[in-house]
Amino acid sequence: MVIKMFKPKGIFYEKEIENYELGKYLLKKYEDTPKVIIENHNNIEEMRKRQNKDFMDMKRNLIIGVRKTHNFVPNHKTSDYLVPYTSSGCTAACMYCYLVCNYNKCAYLRLFVNREKMLDKIIKTAQKSDKTLTFEIGSNSDLILENTITNNLPWTIENFKNTPNGRLTFPTKFDMVD
C-alpha cells in the first residue's frame, strides 16, 4: 500500500504541548501550517459541527494534545491489556474502519505528546508483574502510520527494549518501517 506523506492543512493544539519535547518538535516540523490553540483535544467545536460530507477534509487536520487519562483495559484475546498510547484516529481513509462510523468524534489523527509518562506506566506495570505481560499499544490508531509523523516507533522500541516481563504489540496494515 502506498501512502503519501501526511501534510496537515491545519493543526489544532493544546497550549500545554509546548512543555514537551515531542510537542516542540511537531510545532517546529509544521511551523508553516496554520494553527489554532484549543482547550481540549476531545472537544473541538469547529470539528464537531462539520457535516458528513466533510469527512475527508476533516482528516487533513492534525490534533495535538496531552493524554489526560491512561487506563489499561484488560484484554485476553491478543494481549493482557489494551493501552491508549501516543495517538488516536488515523490519516488514512479505509472504508471498512470502525472510525468512519464515529468520524466527527475521533477519525482525524490526534497525537499525544506525553509519551514518556505513558510508556513509564507500561514499564512499571511490567516490572511489577510475576509473569510476562503483553500490552497492545495500537488499538486506537496505527503506530506505523503515526510514526511517519512522530518517529514514535523507534523511540518506543529504544525506551522499552530492556523491560523485563513486558511485550508490546500493535496491529497495522502499513509497511513503512526501516
Identify the meaning behind each predicted range.
Residues 1-80:
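Flexible, acidic/Gly-rich N-terminal and inter-domain linker regions that tether
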Residues 85-94:
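Cysteine-centered iron-sulfur cluster-binding motifs in ferredoxin-type domains/subunits
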